[in-house]
Amino acid sequence: MIDSDGFRANVGIIICNRYGQVMWARRFGQHSWQFPQGGVDDGETAEEAMYRELYEEVGLRPEHVTILTSTRSWLRYRLPKRLVRQDSKPVCIGQKQKWFLLQLKSQDSAINLSSSGHPEFDDWRWVSYWYPVRQVVSFKRDVYRKVMKEFAVTALSFQTQEIPRKRVRQRTTG
């Protein structure tokens, strides 16, 4: 769905774990990383689109997550001119996104990047909460900053465990 201003309706998904980290995924065959996201189909609510995209992109079902919150409004970003397809009608100049913050209830092993048969991502990892703001492609950075700021209190308050630290083995001489 592209609105009269040329923005495609889209949902963004931030999945957090019990350590306050967020899931960060690498786009298939590329070097760019981002949060899962995808378009809203005609007749679909933003929440329905989020659950569909959640399964298509990372293999998680509603029972694997809890919705903690969503953005109060739609956030927009413009695509760089080189990415705008002028030959498509209507022309899409960017995305307007409703974001959802989810808490993972299941084990990491429930994440399956190949669940749809057409993977969007080829790798993923847990990163610190603010890491994505500095790492996402530049044209999405302002939206990431806004959504992360809006979700920060909620996301970081659901940290239920400390991140396990690797034990350093001490050498003995003797």
From Swiss-Prot:
The UniProt entry's GO CC annotations, sorted and at most eight, read: cytoplasm
Q: Which Gene3D superfamilies match?
A: Nucleoside Triphosphate Pyrophosphohydrolase
Q: What is its EC number?
A: 3.6.1.-
Matching entries from CDD domains are given as: NUDIX_Ap4A_hydrolase_plant_like
Which domain of life does the UniProt lineage start with? Answer: Bacteria
Spell out the molecular function terms from Gene Ontology. Answer: mRNA 5'-diphosphatase activity
Q: Know the name of this protein?
A: RNA pyrophosphohydrolase
Q: Which organism is it from?
A: Shewanella sp. (strain MR-4)
The gene behind this protein is rppH
